[in-house]
């Protein structure tokens, strides 16, 4: 991997330094199956150097949890974190169908390894991790079967 993570900041914020750009986030919009998927990208403060690892965080069944606490912890240690929502969930376009979820995860992973994404968010295309919680764990596992270049998977209480 191209950088060192700062695990000491997993559960607490880094000390304030007015000379360092603060951590921030932006909205994302990615196409999958002809629909626009909405979400956010969170990135760490400017104290982290070099291209960063990036995580695609996939929630479980819509309406359950977005896992904001996990996204914030990963950002604090130096990861870029994308939290996206499948077609028809949390305001994304299209109709929610379980059968679309794997396609959505795969489309997001391909986009997050693209030169445009990596340049815009200073991430390493060879350090993309997928994390899935509950039904998101199953979606991540299935998407990984048809997605090249992933660094790793983390399944949290996966549901099949």
Go through the PLM ranges and name each one:
Residues 2-49:
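N-terminal cap/lid segment of alpha/beta-hydrolase-fold proteins
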Residues 50-60:
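Short beta-strand element of the alpha/beta-hydrolase
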Residues 60-73:
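The serine-hydrolase catalytic nucleophile loop
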Residues 75-93:
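Conserved alpha/beta-hydrolase
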Residues 96-122:
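Alpha/beta-hydrolase active-site loop
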Residues 119-134:
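Alpha/beta-hydrolase fold nucleophile elbow
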Residues 132-142:
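Glycine-rich nucleophile elbow surrounding the catalytic serine of serine-hydrolase chemistry
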Residues 154-160:
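Active-site nucleophile loop of the alpha/beta-hydrolase fold
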């Amino acid at each position: 991997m191209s950088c060192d993570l700062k695990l000491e900041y997993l559960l607490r914020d880094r000390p304030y330094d007015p000379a360092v750009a603060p951590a921030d986030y932006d909205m994302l919009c990615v196409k999958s199956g002809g629909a626009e998927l909405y979400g956010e990208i969170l990135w760490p403060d400017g104290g982290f150097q070099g291209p960063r690892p990036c995580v695609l965080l996939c929630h479980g069944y819509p309406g359950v949890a977005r896992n904001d606490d996990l996204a914030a912890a990963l950002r604090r240690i130096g990861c870029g974190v994308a939290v996206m929502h499948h077609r028809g969930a949390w305001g994304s376009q299209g109709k929610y169908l379980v059968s679309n979820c794997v396609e959505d995860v795969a489309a997001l992973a391909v986009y997050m390894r693209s030169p445009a994404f990596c340049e815009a968010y200073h991430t390493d295309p060879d350090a993309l991790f997928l994390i899935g919680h509950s039904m998101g764990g199953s979606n991540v596992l299935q998407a990984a079967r048809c997605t090249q270049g992933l660094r790793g998977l983390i399944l949290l209480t996966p549901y099949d």
